[in-house]
């Protein structure tokens, strides 16, 4: 029934074969079809950009997004998995700009927006075939055919509906704000887009400027790190309660006003200035000063060029006096609150000075810094120049510094719904949990209004038309609305098409669309609705699949997709858009740096899959810190270790079973009797039923970390305990009930383990299942139901007994290893000390197993350690110091002189009285530090409540037995080297050696049984292989396959 299995297998090739099987037999499609009409499990797939290839950062969420849907499908749910593509926005435009060698908004407009958008449309799906190939090779099942794209007409129309719904609720408004702005892209960014970029350490000029007070020969010393904003200076800010000094500069003979605490920074020599007056900042409020430049002197009659008080001013650096221009958010708010100045923004879309600032016209603002400094120096207004090192945000797409500037933009009013957003967050199950109140929760608490408009071209246009005469606005929520108002057929909603659509206003003007497009994050946040063309299609069905049961993405999406989903879900329906989310961390290169193609600091992921297999990579990622939203320093060796320590051991367990099942012609029945008599069978069956219970509970809670932990623990128990302890049951020649029980138990265990592992490592489990399944079973492992626990087969008491037994054996083996006593060398006695009667009974029940595993002849179970150790004691100064005072040294000395019997009395819970200088002290166990001293020929170890001792006195009989075991190991290795089959019987030849003769005389039957030798013959001519049995003992042996 079973196909022969090779011990060595190339897993990537095996996976390619399984992919062909899935494709040829349409297994994914069948898995979906068989769940039609079942309970829906809603999963949202966040849309990636297809303008680049997937990397390790994509592999983590894509693995998670495969595990959970596979599991839920096996649980009987209908899990639709539609891939999506983010096709609009800055990433696409930036790629096209580079390919067309265009620079900036003006050149794009000259090239033609219609042609530019067509180029965007052409490249936006450039790598979809590669994405499909790579994600499929990873083992992920997802529907690429029925995908959604944010540029689809139906998707864009639903986004308009979302926008209009928010607009009608009063949550959308247009206003001037100071926003982070990308000069190269010529568009503002939202505050969370800024966080997607990098903050870099940069040096900027730090200037102290002299502002002359109006009608006085006195100067304010103001500080700035943005010289380019000085031409638009409209005010000065001081701290209301900060102390200021008016000083005479003795060298320059000028009068300056400066924050008192900052005097020592500017004047290291106190003799260089004289303080003539001191006052609080409130005293300066309202004072006028002379503008540095004459560009905007006309703003004086609107409140410009005055001193204001502001809370953000400090004396931590600078002068305690700050210049105000409308290019900082706080500055802008002060001007807005205290003046009626015009919106002064003399820079163009690419942040170059316009003709309003004639001295620097055409210069990029940052490039103008030095010229502005030279100008101020020539005007004798530069007091001091320094360099200032600080962290500054860079554009996440162009890697160029952002500029903060006032700009007209459209916003979602987050302040209005902030409390609702916080309540929505309470409904979400975050994995890991700390994100709810931590990173995401705090982000919500401090969330600002969301700038959703972009001054770009390839995006979903903001659906607002304004009357050219009155400014009256009409918000459009569907194609039908636009067609009725314009009288034109709408077949494309992109900017180059609908900007041409206008209609006359009843007020005499014309309705023209506002020029901006939507932030692509608004589109991805609309994905739950737009991917279903809600509310234009299947409106009634939508409520059954919203919110999503599950989503998964990287940690950066706490300020991206997770955030926009939450905003729009709350704004539209006052509920979160998803119930459960698994958040992964970042995958970094092995040196902890960001993975970079240019630095070539990581291996191509496809090369990793082709070397180690996708299953190994999937497990490596899921087992790593990245699954807990922590960073992972990726290494190829880590994937290799997973292959070596997990994938191959699973294969070996399977290979072991198949090898002997074929030899013994074992044929499994559809029904397996699981009520076994052998303690190992009962134990492993109980363990796998417990595993089913735990896995179902943990995966239902989306706890993949715990799920993997218990799976790996079980694999270790299966391989290194059950199979290892049961080998002789499979080897023996007679097919008795015990052997049949072993086959049935291992078969049942392997098949159920494969079913449980299937969502995690879909390739290997499919391969093994195909050989294990019986005639009437499902075509693929992934068409099966997920295993459910048979409660009556769980024996917790037996599991605890076996776990305790294994713990004792592990401690004893560690003791042997620490004293270089090889496990093949038998010892006479193992002593196990525990006061716990339940543990003592377990040890008696498991005596045979313990003796075999420790290679000991007898076991002695005791309640006390007296037979193993003698005791010495030292004073516990930490405990005694506070209560003994001056007698501390004397008591400590007395404790070192306590007898073994005295210490035993203390160990048994009694007090021991020590008298010093007529003072008595009751000494208890916590007052002393115990030292155990091993008795002769004993090696002792203590761990928790267990003490183990090994009698290391080796008799000649024990010595010979140890050599026999070493001989058996060497023969087994020789069988492997000779490529003998595991069932091949052999003739074992030996030389005429005195020690070897003794070994054979004492242990002949044991050696024959273990090596499958039918006879052992002395034949010096055929015993040509020299083996070392011990450091001083070499023997010659030979083996020959028996042909009978």
UniProtKB/Swiss-Prot annotation:
It catalyses: tRNA(Ile) + L-isoleucine + ATP = L-isoleucyl-tRNA(Ile) + AMP + diphosphate. One of its GO terms (molecular function) is tRNA binding. The keyword Transport does not apply. ATP binds at residue 597. It is found in: Cytoplasm. It comes from the Bacteria. Pfam families: Anticodon_1, DUF5915, tRNA-synt_1. IleRS has two distinct active sites: one for aminoacylation and one for editing. The misactivated valine is translocated from the active site to the editing site, which sterically excludes the correctly activated isoleucine. The single editing site contains two valyl binding pockets, one specific for each substrate (Val-AMP or Val-tRNA(Ile)). NCBIfam families: ileS. Catalyzes the attachment of isoleucine to tRNA(Ile). As IleRS can inadvertently accommodate and process structurally similar amino acids such as valine, to avoid such errors it has two additional distinct tRNA(Ile)-dependent editing activities. One activity is designated as 'pretransfer' editing and involves the hydrolysis of activated Val-AMP. The other activity is designated 'posttransfer' editing and involves deacylation of mischarged Val-tRNA(Ile). Monomer. This is Isoleucine--tRNA ligase. It comes from Borrelia recurrentis (strain A1). The gene is ileS.
């Amino acid at each position: 029934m079973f196909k022969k299995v090779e011990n060595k297998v190339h897993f990537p090739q095996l996976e390619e074969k399984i992919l062909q099987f899935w494709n040829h037999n349409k297994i994914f499609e069948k898995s979906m079809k068989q769940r039609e009409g079942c309970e829906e499990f809603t999963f949202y797939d966040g849309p990636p950009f297809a303008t680049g290839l997937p990397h390790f950062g994509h592999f983590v969420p894509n693995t998670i997004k495969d595990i959970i849907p596979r599991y839920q499908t096996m649980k009987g749910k209908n899990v639709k998995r539609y891939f999506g593509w983010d096709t609009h926005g800055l990433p696409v435009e930036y790629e096209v700009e580079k390919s067309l060698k265009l620079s900036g908004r003006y050149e794009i407009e000259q090239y033609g927006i219609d042609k530019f958008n067509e180029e965007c449309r052409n490249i936006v799906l450039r790598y979809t075939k590669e994405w499909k190939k790579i994600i499929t090779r990873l083992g992920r099942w997802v529907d690429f055919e029925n995908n959604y794209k944010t540029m689809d007409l139906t998707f864009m129309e639903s986004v308009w509906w979302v926008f209009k719904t928010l607009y009608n609720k009063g949550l959308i408004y247009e206003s001037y704000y100071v926003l982070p702005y990308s000069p190269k892209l010529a568009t503002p960014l939202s505050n969370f887009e800024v966080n997607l970029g990098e903050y870099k350490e940069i040096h900027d000029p730090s200037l102290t400027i002299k502002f002359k007070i109006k009608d006085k020969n006195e100067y304010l010393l103001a500080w700035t790190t943005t010289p380019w904003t000085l031409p638009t200076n409209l005010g000065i800010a001081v701290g209301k309660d900060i102390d200021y000094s008016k000083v005479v500069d003795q060298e320059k003979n000028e009068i300056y006003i400066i924050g008192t605490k900052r005097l020592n920074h500017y004047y290291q020599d106190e003799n260089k200035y004289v303080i003539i007056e001191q006052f609080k900042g409130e005293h300066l409020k309202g004072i006028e000063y002379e503008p540095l430049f004459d560009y905007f002197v006309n703003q004086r009659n609107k409140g410009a060029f005055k001193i204001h008080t502001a809370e953000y001013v400090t004396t931590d650096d600078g002068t305690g006096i700050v210049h105000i221009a409308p290019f900082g958010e706080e500055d802008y708010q002060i001007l807005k609150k205290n003046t009626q100045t015009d919106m002064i923004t003399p820079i163009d879309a690419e942040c170059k000075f316009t003709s309003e600032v004639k001295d620097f016209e055409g210069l990029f603002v940052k490039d103008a810094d030095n010229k502005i400094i030279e100008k101020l120096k020539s005007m004798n207004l530069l007091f001091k120049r320094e360099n200032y090192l600080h962290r500054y945000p860079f554009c996440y797409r162009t890697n160029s510094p952002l500029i903060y500037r006032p700009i007209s933009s459209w916003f979602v009013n987050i302040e209005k719904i902030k409390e609702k957003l916080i309540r929505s967050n309470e409904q979400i199950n975050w994995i890991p949990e700390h994100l709810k109140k931590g990173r995401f929760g705090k982000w919500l608490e401090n969330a600002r209004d969301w700038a959703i408009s972009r001054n770009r071209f390839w995006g979903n246009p903001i659906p607002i038309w304004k009357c050219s005469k009155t400014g009256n606005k009409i918000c459009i929520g569907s194609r039908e609305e636009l067609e009725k108002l314009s009288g034109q057929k709408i077949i494309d909603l992109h900017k180059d098409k609908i900007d041409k659509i206008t209609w006359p206003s009843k007020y005499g003007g014309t309705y023209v669309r506002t020029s901006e497009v939507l932030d692509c994050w608004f589109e991805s946040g609309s994905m739950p609705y737009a991917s279903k063309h809600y509310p234009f299609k299947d409106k009634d069905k939508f409520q059954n699949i919203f919110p999503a049961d599950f989503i998964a993405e990287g940690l950066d999406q706490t300020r991206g997709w997770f955030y926009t989903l939450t905003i729009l879900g709350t704004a539209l329906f006052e509920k979160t858009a998803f119930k459960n989310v698994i958040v992964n961390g970042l995958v970094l290169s092995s040196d902890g740096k960001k993975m970079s193609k240019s630095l070539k600091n990581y291996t191509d992921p496809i090369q990793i899959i082709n070397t180690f297999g996708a299953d190994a990579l999937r497990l490596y990622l899921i087992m790593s810190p990245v699954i807990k939203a922590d960073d992972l320093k990726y290494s190829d060796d880590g994937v290799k270790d997973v292959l070596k320590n997990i994938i191959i051991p699973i294969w070996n367990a399977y290979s072991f079973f198949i090898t002997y099942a074929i030899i013994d012609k074992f044929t499994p029945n559809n029904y397996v009797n699981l009520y076994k008599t052998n303690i190992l069978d009962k134990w492993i069956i109980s363990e796998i039923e417990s595993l089913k219970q735990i896995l179902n509970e943990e995966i239902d809670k989306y706890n993949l970390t715990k799920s993997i932990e218990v799976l790996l623990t079980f694999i270790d128990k299966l391989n290194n305990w059950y199979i290892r302890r049961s080998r002789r049951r499979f080897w023996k020649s007679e097919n008795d009930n015990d052997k049949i029980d072993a086959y049935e138990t291992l078969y049942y265990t392997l098949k159920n383990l494969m079913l449980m592992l299937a969502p995690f490592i879909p390739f290997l489990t499919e391969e093994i299942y195909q050989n294990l399944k019986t005639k009437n079973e499902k075509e693929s492992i992934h068409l099966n139901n997920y295993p459910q626990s048979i409660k009556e087969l769980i024996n917790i008491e037996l599991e605890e007994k076996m776990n305790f037994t294994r713990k004792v054996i592990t401690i004893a083996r560690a003791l042997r290893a620490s004293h270089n006593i090889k496990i093949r060398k038998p010892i006479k006695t193992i002593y196990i000390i525990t006061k716990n009667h339940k543990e003592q009974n377990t040890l008696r029940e498991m005596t045979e197993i313990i003796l075999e595993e420790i290679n000991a002849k007898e076991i002695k179970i005791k309640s006390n350690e007296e037979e193993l150790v003698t005791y010495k004691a030292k004073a516990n100064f930490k405990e005694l110091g506070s209560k003994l005072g001056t007698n501390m040294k004397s008591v400590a000395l007395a404790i070192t002189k306590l007898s073994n019997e005295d210490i035993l009395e203390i160990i048994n819970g009694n007090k021991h009285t020590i008298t010093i200088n007529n003072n008595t002290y009751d000494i208890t166990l916590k007052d002393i530090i115990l030292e155990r001293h091993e008795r002769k020929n004993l090696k002792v170890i203590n761990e928790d409540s267990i003490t183990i001792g090994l009698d290391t006195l080796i008799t000649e009989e024990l010595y010979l037995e140890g050599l026999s075991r070493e001989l058996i190991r060497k023969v087994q290795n020789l069988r492997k080297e000779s490529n003998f089959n595991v069932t091949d019987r052999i003739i074992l030849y030996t030389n005429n050696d005195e020690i070897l003769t003794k070994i054979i005389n004492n242990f002949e039957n044991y050696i024959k049984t273990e090596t499958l030798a039918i006879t052992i013959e002395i034949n010096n001519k055929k015993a040509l292989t020299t083996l070392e049995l011990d450091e001083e003992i070499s023997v010659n042996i030979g083996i020959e396959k028996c042909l009978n």
